[in-house]
Regions:
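Flexible phosphate-sensing "switch/lid" loops adjacent to ATP/NTP-binding sites
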Residues: 1-555
Length: 555
């Protein structure tokens, strides 16, 4: 059966029954239909959090199809519950861009899914829409103020850096001109769209601790400059309150369930390649307040999502993982060993031996932060016993246990061994989290630290444009913010063609953006863009809905 067919046959519990497992009263539920609900922020309890374990799921450098972090995260949650732990999956919400683009649905796979799968993948509770509207309200107010003859604060339209957003892959919107059609239609200027997960509003929502923190961060959004050169922030446009009220419901985490009726909290959804790649601080803290174990993921490989989770989210929120799971597939190791796409599913020990260096590097990346790891080999039927044995042998030499995870085909039953390995690490107390750099270091030093220690680069270069922008960042006083590096997820380097573990390479910062509201600087490496495009044959072409409302092709 397909993922969708499995999800459609799920025996779901009413959401109030799922909430009871977490001792949440019906009065504290804000239902969105029968199987989804919003949760109030007062459920976060700092004292209860102290007794809970936080497990981060990351991965090796993925193939375009992904290596199953979400599937492993959900499967691990099922496995932990099977061995007697009160575990909650705390994950990101899917973006419509990848759903209709290259990946299809993003709610797990096989027998390790969160449900209702169709709802989660298609609009869910409207959080992304609220983020989009708050973002675009600011855009509308900026252009309105530029045009106004009586209310203008003197924004120079040439300096506006705030972009509109839409939750769809649409390369045609990357660079546009707005305000055409004559003076009554606005002042013409260059603009563009980012995808909603790359919006600073998304980043702000994901890092905010409460409503007042949300409003403070929104007020700190940098918009551009006045004609006299002074900076303009969102607070100068008197729109912070209106933007915040659009996020009134979006700030609340969403409760759903797994196929085995265990609780899952989904909230926020920034990408890890072009944003910070982790769910909200509020959802993570709520999970830690309600359960014994929280299983959360960070997007793409440990060079992207995990690095940002640890250096940005954990530092900002005062969190520290007790264990890290590095997801690897034999398929991806073959890929890094030089296998062509049509060879991914053909056993080839030699290719695995050539590609294993990528896994070794990601294990080292976790260890750089003082954290203990376990490797989850996300099992596929075409994995040979000798390939699996080799991966286990290499991991053992690195002091790390590797466990086969069969959550996709078996659900929680197939992840019990992984769950026990995670519990052993989490309860050993051997993880001692330390961020990779001090926020007091210079922007250049922070970038160099990540590039050399995590990517393995020998040097960081800067374009003339980047150097000019860096001067502006320092002048504005944003140099003490952490860095959220935008980079290809397909390689440890900034060149997607360099597979496995490249050596003796340099990376280039092409330009800078900064998210002063969210609280980080954004160095952009290579040719990465913040508005993806659709593939030649998008997943959307295979989707449909019949007269009975039954969806097909969403997988």
């Amino acid at each position: 059966m397909t993922d969708l067919e499995i999800a459609q046959k799920a025996q779901m519990l009413p959401i109030k029954e799922v909430a009871k497992k977490l001792n949440i009263s019906e009065d504290d539920l804000d239902p969105y239909g029968k199987y989804k609900a919003k949760l109030p922020l007062h459920l976060i309890n700092a004292e209860k959090m102290k007794n809970s374990k936080l497990v981060l799921v990351t991965a090796i450098t993925p193939t375009p199809a992904g290596e199953g972090k979400t599937t492993v995260s959900i499967g691990l949650t099922e496995g932990l519950n099977k061995i007697g732990k009160k575990a909650i999956a705390v994950l990101r919400e899917p973006s419509l861009g990848p759903v209709f683009g290259i990946k299809g649905g993003a709610a797990g796979g096989g027998y390790s899914q969160v449900v209702p799968m169709e709802d989660i993948n298609l609009h869910f509770t409207g959080d992304f829409s609220a983020i989009e509207k708050a973002n675009n309200l600011l855009s509308a107010v900026i252009d309105n103020n530029i045009q106004s003859k009586t209310h203008s604060i003197g924004i120079d339209p040439r300096t506006v850096v705030w972009k509109r957003v839409m939750d769809m892959n649409d390369r045609a919107l990357r660079h546009i001109v707005v305000g055409l059609g004559g003076s009554t239609h606005g002042i013409p200027r260059e603009d563009g769209f980012n995808i909603t997960p790359a919006s600073e509003i998304m980043a702000i929502l994901c890092l905010s601790e409460n409503f007042s923190d949300l409003k403070r961060r929104i007020g700190n959004i940098y918009v551009g400059k006045k004609f006299d050169g002074t900076p303009v922030f969102a607070r100068d446009l008197n729109v912070v309150g209106a933007m915040a009220l659009l996020l009134k419901e979006a700030i609340k985490p969403n409760l759903v369930q797994t196929l085995e009726n265990n609780p899952a909290i989904l909230h926020g959804g920034p990408f890890a390649s072009i944003a910070q790649g982790t769910n909200t601080v509020l959802a993570t803290k709520m999970g830690l307040s309600l359960g014994d174990y929280v299983v959360t993921e960070a997007g793409f490989g440990a060079d992207l999502g995990a690095e940002k989770f640890l250096n940005i989210k954990c530092v900002s929120a005062g969190l520290a993982p007790d264990a890290v799971v590095v997801v690897a597939t034999i398929r991806a190791l073959r890929h890094h060993g030089g296998a062509k796409k049509e060879e991914y599913n053909t056993p080839d020990l030699q290719k695995v031996k050539l590609g294993i260096a990528n896994l070794e590097k990601h294990i080292e990346n976790v260890q750089h932060f003082g954290l203990k790891a376990v490797v989850a080999i996300n099992y596929f039927p075409h994995d040979s016993e000798e390939e699996i044995a080799y991966v286990k042998e290499i991991c053992a030499k690195k002091g790390v246990e590797a466990v086969v995870s069969k959550g996709f085909s078996e659900g929680g039953k197939g992840t019990e061994e992984l769950a026990r390995a995670v519990v052993t690490i989490a309860e050993s107390g051997e993880s001692h989290f330390a961020p990779l750099y001090s926020h007091e270091a210079s922007i250049e030093d922070k970038i160099t630290t990540v590039a050399t220690k995590i990517y393995g680069a020998s040097k960081v270069n800067y374009s003339s444009k980047a150097l000019s922008q860096l001067k502006q960042i320092n002048k504005l006083g944003f140099d003490k913010l952490p860095v959220c590096i935008v980079k290809t997820p397909k390689s440890l380097s900034d060149d997607e063609k360099k597979l496995a573990r490249p050596t003796d390479f340099e990376v280039t910062v092409r330009e800078f953006e900064f998210a002063s509201g969210a609280g980080f600087v954004i160095p952009i490496l290579g040719d990465t863009v913040r508005m993806p495009g659709l593939p030649s044959v998008p997943a959307a072409e295979g989707m449909d809905i019949d007269d009975e409302g039954i969806i097909s092709g969403l997988s």
